[in-house]
C-alpha cells in the first residue's frame, strides 16, 4: 500500500477486509458518517512485499515451514531488527477515527502473578467514537534474545461522546512475558523470566505509545514452566537473532520410525488432499436431449428469458449455488449446469483471507 501513502491526492483511506456478506453495507455506513471506524491493523504494512523476510521462502516446502525470522514474526521483526523500522508505512495496531482521543495512564501496579494498568481515555474530537488502548512490554536482553516490543493486552472503549471519558483497566500475567529456552542457555525446555528491567508502553499502536509510569524489576531468573523436549525441529539449521545475525542450531533426527509423529506417505494418499481439479462437470458424457444451450444465448440465437424458462427449480439452485466444495480449498463456484453448457465460475468466499499457497487461482476479497 505504499501507493496510498505516497500519493498526495489521497488524504485518507478506508480499508475493509474479512467483511463477509455485510461488509459492503458496513463500509457504506462508515463512508457516510453513520458509523465511525475504530479498527486496528493486526498486521504490519510494509512498503514492499520483499520487505517481509518470509517472502524469500514462502511455501518452499509442503513438509515444513522454515520461519527464518524465528520469534521475530510480524511486527516483532519490524520493531526489532536494525533498519527494518524504516520499511513500515502503517504499523501494527494502527487505525484512525473521525474523532481524536487523549490517553492518560493514571496507575500501574503489579501483584505476584500479574501486571495492571489503568488508562483514562477522553474523546477530544467532535464525533462519537471508540478507541483501542494497547499495552506493550520490552523484556531485558539477556542470554535469551527477545523482540523490542510485544503486545501484552488491549481493550476497546465503549462509544464515547465528544468530551466523554472512560477508565480502562488492562492486565496480563507475568508469565506471558516469559521466553522459552530450547537450547539450555539458562534452563533447557523451560519458560523463563530473565532478570532485569521490564518496561511497559501504552498507546494506540506499536509506534504511538508512551512509556508507562512504572517498570518491573527482577533480580533473579524466574522459571514459570518446566517442560521436556518433544517434536524437536529436524530441518531448522539456524535462526535469526535480534541484531539480524543468525545462530546455528543443533540438528536432531528421528532415530526410530515409531517415535515419529507422521510417517512419510506416497503422494496422493494423504487424507483430505486437495483435489487437483477443483470444479468438475456433473456429467462427463451426456446428450443435451433437446436442452437449449447457453452458447446460443451468447451468440444471439436465443433470448436469455427463453433459456431461463426451461430450467427447473433444482437447475436454478445449481445456477445460484454452483458446485459444492468437495475438498479443502474453501472456494465456491457459480453456474455448474454442464447439461445446459453453463460452466462453473470460481469465486472466493466473501470473507476469504490470505492464501496459504505460493500461487492461487482466485484472488481474495477486500474493499
What are these regions (language model features)?
Residues 1, 47-49, 139-141, 174:
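Acidic, glycine-rich active-site loops and adjacent beta-strand->loop/helix elements
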Residues 2-130, 162, 190-205, 209, ...:
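Secreted, periplasmic, or luminal enzymes acting at the cell surface/secretory milieu
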Residues 122-124, 138, 171-175:
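Solvent-exposed residues in well-ordered beta-strands and their adjoining turns
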Residues 126-143, 149:
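Short acidic, flexible loop segments centered on an aromatic residue
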Residues 143-186:
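Intrinsically disordered, low-complexity Pro/Gly/Ser/Thr-rich segments with frequent PxxP/GP/PP motifs
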Residues 288-341:
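N-terminal amphipathic, basic-rich helices that act as targeting or association modules
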Residues 362-367:
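Short, intrinsically disordered, charge-balanced linker/junction segments flanking boundaries
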Amino acid at each position: 500500500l505504499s501507493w496510498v501513502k505516497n500519493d498526495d491526492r489521497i488524504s485518507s483511506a478506508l480499508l475493509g477486509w474479512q467483511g463477509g456478506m455485510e461488509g459492503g453495507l458496513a463500509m457504506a455506513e462508515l463512508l457516510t458518517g453513520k458509523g465511525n471506524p475504530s479498527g486496528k491493523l493486526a498486521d504490519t504494512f510494509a512498503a514492499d512485499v520483499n520487505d517481509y523476510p518470509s517472502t524469500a521462502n514462502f511455501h518452499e516446502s509442503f513438509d515444513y515451514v522454515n520461519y527464518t525470522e524465528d520469534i521475530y514474526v510480524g511486527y516483532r521483526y519490524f520493531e526489532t531488527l536494525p533498519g527494518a523500522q524504516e520499511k513500515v508505512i502503517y504499523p501494527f495496531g494502527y487505525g484512525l477515527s473521525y474523532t481524536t482521543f487523549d490517553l492518560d495512564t493514571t496507575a500501574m501496579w503489579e501483584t505476584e502473578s500479574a501486571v495492571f494498568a489503568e488508562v483514562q481515555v477522553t474523546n477530544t474530537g467532535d464525533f462519537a467514537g471508540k478507541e483501542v488502548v494497547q499495552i506493550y512490554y520490552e523484556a531485558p536482553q539477556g542470554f535469551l534474545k527477545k523482540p523490542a516490543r510485544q503486545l501484552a493486552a488491549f481493550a476497546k472503549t465503549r462509544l464515547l461522546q465528544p468530551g466523554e471519558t472512560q477508565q480502562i483497566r488492562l492486565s496480563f500475567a507475568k508469565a506471558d512475558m516469559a521466553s522459552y529456552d530450547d537450547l539450555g542457555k539458562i534452563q533447557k525446555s523451560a519458560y523463563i523470566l530473565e532478570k532485569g528491567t521490564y518496561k511497559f508502553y501504552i498507546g494506540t499502536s506499536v509506534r504511538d505509545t508512551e512509556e508507562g509510569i512504572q517498570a518491573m524489576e527482577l533480580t533473579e531468573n524466574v522459571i514459570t514452566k518446566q517442560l521436556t523436549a518433544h517434536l524437536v525441529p529436524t530441518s531448522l539449521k539456524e535462526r535469526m537473532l535480534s541484531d539480524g545475525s543468525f545462530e546455528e542450531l543443533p540438528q536432531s533426527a528421528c532415530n526410530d520410525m515409531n517415535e515419529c509423529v507422521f510417517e512419510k506417505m506416497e503422494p496422493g494418499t494423504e487424507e483430505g488432499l486437495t483435489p487437483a481439479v477443483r470444479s468438475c462437470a456433473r456429467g462427463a458424457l451426456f446428450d443435451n436431449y433437446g436442452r437449449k444451450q447457453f452458447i446460443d444465448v451468447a451468440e444471439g440465437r436465443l433470448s436469455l428469458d427463453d433459456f431461463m424458462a426451461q430450467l427447473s427449480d433444482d437447475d436454478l439452485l445449481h445456477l445460484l449455488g454452483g458446485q459444492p466444495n468437495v475438498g479443502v480449498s474453501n472456494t465456491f463456484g457459480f453456474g455448474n449446469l454442464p447439461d445446459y453448457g453453463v460452466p462453473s465460475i470460481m469465486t472466493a468466499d466473501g470473507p476469504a483471507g490470505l492464501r496459504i499457497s505460493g500461487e492461487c487461482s482466485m484472488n481474495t476479497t477486500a474493499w
